[in-house]
């Protein structure tokens, strides 16, 4: 019986087939893993081959279904080929990670197996990129760079796959290696842009990595300032949200409309997706005039220092209409007209619960330890508005402290308005803390982790979590933190394996920093000669450790813990 399919039926078959193939892929992946655990090596290899063939056959089945009543288009054909390669590459990575955790020797063997695969001319960009990532996770950095060279040579236009090698290094906390990779990728991309004549377009497109989190959207501040400082204002930047992707905060994105244009059909008509991919700028790093690409944090410090040295004003201001609307909502929240308020946001695991369960981090804190500081601000005539999401632990009702996060007034609009209209912002290491500075609002950042990557805005102050060593039976010095993984990792597993644990800031330390920020805003901070000396000693240490100057360490905290400035003999 001849199978006839309408366009709707074909779409339905495509969806069903995708679900079926992904489900079967996951099943086979776990079957392979169990085979490995119970030493059924022959069964494991057979299952692995079956997994690869399954994906290829499903893709071919789709092609057959489409071609029964019409010729398949090139775009549809390439879609299925890409689907096959991406699922296969992802399965490779997941399988490798599982093996590596159990036995690093097995990881090395599997890495060598895939290195041989990469030598074949038909090896996909995804497989080469994923194998380079495997090499990085095993400390085989030279091999990773060699694979990157192969990737660039064979797939010069696949900028995204090249960049992902650097992202893998970044996720593993190998920031210097990530910058080396991004520098190589950037140099290749610029050569390619000139070779293809794309530089004449004077256009750039924002890559999907800019829309992953609200902090990424806020970091457009640094991206655009860098562009302005280097005289590239005539280069247009385009924004286009990929299908199936949702903005973390569309209201914040709309604030960039004076600097970023929405991609339209007229712009697209003369540009292939391939060329747009080449012209996409990623969130992770920014290329500088010296030829080096710097990670977003280090780039942020360099750009912001120059911006403030030239006495330039913030790019964004709360719009007049938004201010009127926001002030109306403030009154409904219980903040009288002409009253000042401070925003408070303390990171909790609920918003990224799934991620936190699989990757326990060091950036969360206890909201209860912030209440003494909040009460002190209320006693001084202010209001404290707690920001966050619906997963936050509820606050006990207190005069002047407003739990906006769990109120009916919570919205994307008010999130941005509150961050841009408060006197200052009290926060932890979270993307929301990057919104106030783009409106020129200073931040007092607490329980900061890791110490090696502070917020990069110079008007901010911060206090880090300290780290206790079970082996040494004491807290690590600042030098010991900054010159080891302890000062750069935001994941607990790296600390636990070294017998280390983070120590949260005390309520007294938090209150001290908050009042220090209030005094700073009011122009009432006076530093002694000894204070200046302590700060210089700490900043010199930070630069020596290849970190950067951004937010200043709280002076009260530095006085309390000045013993941690001692030179260490354990690193």
Predicted regions and their residues:
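N-terminal targeting/anchoring "stem" of glycan-biosynthesis enzymes
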Residues: 2-40, 44, 51-67, 71-106, ...
